[in-house]
Each structure stands twice: as structure tokens, then as C-alpha cells.
């Protein structure tokens, strides 16, 4: 991905995906339990995913056995799938999902990457204690129309590094979410605003599930699942590279991200009257009988002609 210019590796999101679709195999020793979106323990595949938040493309994906959120699992995943690909000096920020809440995980990411880490925090006993301390101080400020935020700085054990802890509360329901960042030089508002950069990994995982069949590995053994994930990653990178060389402005989002596979498939293949022939050069020739109102197919033809 880096060689073809579709990955920068500067701002990286780390996420975890629980695929309970194979929970019908509770007796299979290749599976272990994991909480799904509802918090219920199910037998599942649990890939961990690295995403480039700036270019909106996958960096790596790996099958995880055992406790996927344990410090040892995160260490193994990052050492084998992140730092062998991206030099820590290149990374400017890591955004972590709440599934990785834990002081050891945070300390590992901070020390190993030598960069700033921002994350949503699951409310375990320590986070709840910090939350109550922050709320008691009562130093709230408005954040949008429905929320208010408060913060305090804490010191991480072992490193002595300052960590800005933020409570975001819904003013109508009093529901709270917690966030944290090593960016103690940022205001709480700026930290929350910058955390949105992590969102592409959420839509990216949905794209992998819907268009690349991430949740449908051809088997239950770790080897087959790992191979499936590798093929999914290559397929997504191939499409991202294709979009980068085609440079079709009509397929760019307002954030200048390229469209997803389903958009390409619809524009090129859906509801099209076509004729397939062999031209004078002996090549297969696909002719769109309904024309090319958007000019996309003409641009694609020019690209393919150059690459013959």
C-alpha cells in the first residue's frame, strides 16, 4: 500500500471487529468467546484492524486468538502488523477504540510508537473513579447543543506521562462517555474534535463486511480465516489503488475520499446494455450501448489503454 501511494501511515486507527456469524459452532476449538455489540458473550472470529485515517484505507488485518484486548495480544498484533510496516517515526497519532481501554495497553502504545494516543475509554472501575472525580469538580463547558464536557489531567503509572481525561455528558439524559489523550497541550474540545479522524475505520469495517465478505471466511480454522482476511485486505487495497490512478472526481466524497466498491459496481455494471466482442487486435472489447453520460467509462478506457 505504501509503495503504491495509498497509505501514508501518519494518523492510524486501531480497531477490533467481533464477527459472531459463526457462533453456530460452539464446539469448535478454533473459536473463543467475545462480547458482541450487545455485550453478550458469543463464539466469534475477532480480527484486529489497522486503518489509515487520512487516506481512508486499510493498513493491515490479522486473526486474533485468545483474549484480543489483552496487553499481550495488542503487543503481538502491533509488533507484527504495524511496526514492521510503518516506521514509528512516521506515525504522528494513534486513535484507539474503547475495546483497548487499559493502562498497560495505553502505556505500550505511547512508549512503543513515541507519539500521541487518543482513545475512547470503556468505563471500567478506574475510569469510573476518574469520571466521578471529574464530575464532582463541576467545571463544565458546553459542547454542541446536547452535550457538556469536563476534564482533568492524571499521571500514567510507570511513565509519569500526563494524560488528559475527558467526560462528555448528554445534558438531557445525563449519559456519559469518556475519552483520553496524551495531548495535554490540546483543549478538551480540540481532543474530541480530532477524535473524529478515527471514524473512517468504522465505515471501513462496514465496507469490508458488505462488499468484501469479511464475515464469511471459507472455514473455521485459524489458517483459513487468516488467509481470508489477507485476501480481503488485498482486494480493498487493489480497489483503492485503482481509484488513485483513475482519479475520477465524480467518485470523491466531500472529504476527498474515494468511493466504495458498491458505488463502482453500480456505475460500471448495473443496469447497463453492453456488447462483448473481439477487436482487430484480438482483445476483448466491451461496448456500452447506452453511452457514457458521466464520462467515467471513457476515462477508464483511456487508463486501460495506457496500461496495455
Where are these regions (language model features)?
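Short, solvent-exposed helix-loop connector elements
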Residues: 187-195, 210-227, 246-251
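Short acidic, glycine/serine/threonine-rich loops at helix termini
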Residues: 22-31, 104-108, 129-133
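Short, conserved catalytic/metal-binding motifs centered on acidic residues
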Residues: 8-22, 56, 91-101, 117, ...
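Domain-level cores of phosphate- or acyl-group-handling catalytic modules
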Residues: 65-129
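A short, flexible helix-boundary coil/loop motif
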Residues: 138-156, 235-308
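Electropositive, glycine- and tryptophan-enriched low-complexity nucleic-acid-binding patches
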Residues: 36-87, 176-177
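Active-site-proximal, Lys/Arg-enriched surface segment
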Residues: 1-51
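An anionic, glycine-rich sequence signature occurring as long contiguous blocks
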Residues: 112-203, 208-209, 299-308
Amino acid at each position: 500500500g505504501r509503495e503504491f501511494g495509498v497509505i501514508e501511515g501518519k494518523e492510524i486507527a486501531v480497531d477490533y471487529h467481533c464477527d459472531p456469524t459463526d457462533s453456530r459452532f460452539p464446539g469448535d476449538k478454533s473459536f473463543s468467546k467475545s462480547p458482541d455489540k450487545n455485550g453478550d458473550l458469543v463464539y466469534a472470529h475477532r480480527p484486529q484492524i489497522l486503518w489509515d485515517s487520512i487516506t481512508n484505507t486499510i493498513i493491515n488485518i490479522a486473526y486474533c486468538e485468545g483474549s484480543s484486548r489483552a496487553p499481550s495480544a495488542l503487543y503481538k498484533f502491533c509488533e507484527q502488523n504495524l511496526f514492521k510496516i510503518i516506521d514509528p517515526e512516521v506515525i504522528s497519532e494513534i486513535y484507539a477504540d474503547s475495546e483497548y481501554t487499559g493502562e498497560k495497553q495505553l502505556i505500550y502504545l505511547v512508549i512503543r510508537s513515541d507519539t500521541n494516543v487518543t482513545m475512547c475509554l470503556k468505563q471500567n472501575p478506574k475510569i469510573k473513579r476518574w469520571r466521578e472525580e471529574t464530575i464532582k469538580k463541576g467545571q463544565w463547558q458546553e459542547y454542541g447543543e446536547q452535550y457538556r464536557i469536563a476534564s482533568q489531567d492524571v499521571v500514567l503509572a510507570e511513565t509519569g506521562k500526563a494524560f488528559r481525561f475527558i467526560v462528555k455528558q448528554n445534558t438531557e439524559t445525563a449519559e456519559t462517555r469518556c475519552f483520553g489523550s496524551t495531548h495535554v497541550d490540546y483543549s478538551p474540545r480540540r481532543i474530541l474534535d480530532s477524535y473524529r479522524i478515527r471514524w473512517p475505520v468504522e465505515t471501513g469495517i462496514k465496507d469490508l463486511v458488505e462488499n468484501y465478505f469479511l464475515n464469511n471466511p471459507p472455514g473455521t480454522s485459524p489458517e483459513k480465516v487468516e488467509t481470508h482476511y489477507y485476501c480481503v485486505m488485498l482486494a480493498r487495497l487493489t480497489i483503492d489503488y485503482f481509484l488513485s490512478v483513475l482519479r475520477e472526481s465524480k467518485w470523491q466524497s466531500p472529504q476527498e475520499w474515494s468511493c466504495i466498491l458498491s458505488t463502482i459496481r453500480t456505475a460500471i455494471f448495473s443496469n447497463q446494455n453492453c456488447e462483448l466482442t473481439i477487436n482487430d487486435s484480438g482483445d476483448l472489447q466491451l461496448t456500452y450501448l447506452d453511452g457514457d453520460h458521466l464520462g467515467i467509462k471513457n476515462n477508464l478506457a483511456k487508463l486501460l489503454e495506457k496500461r496495455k
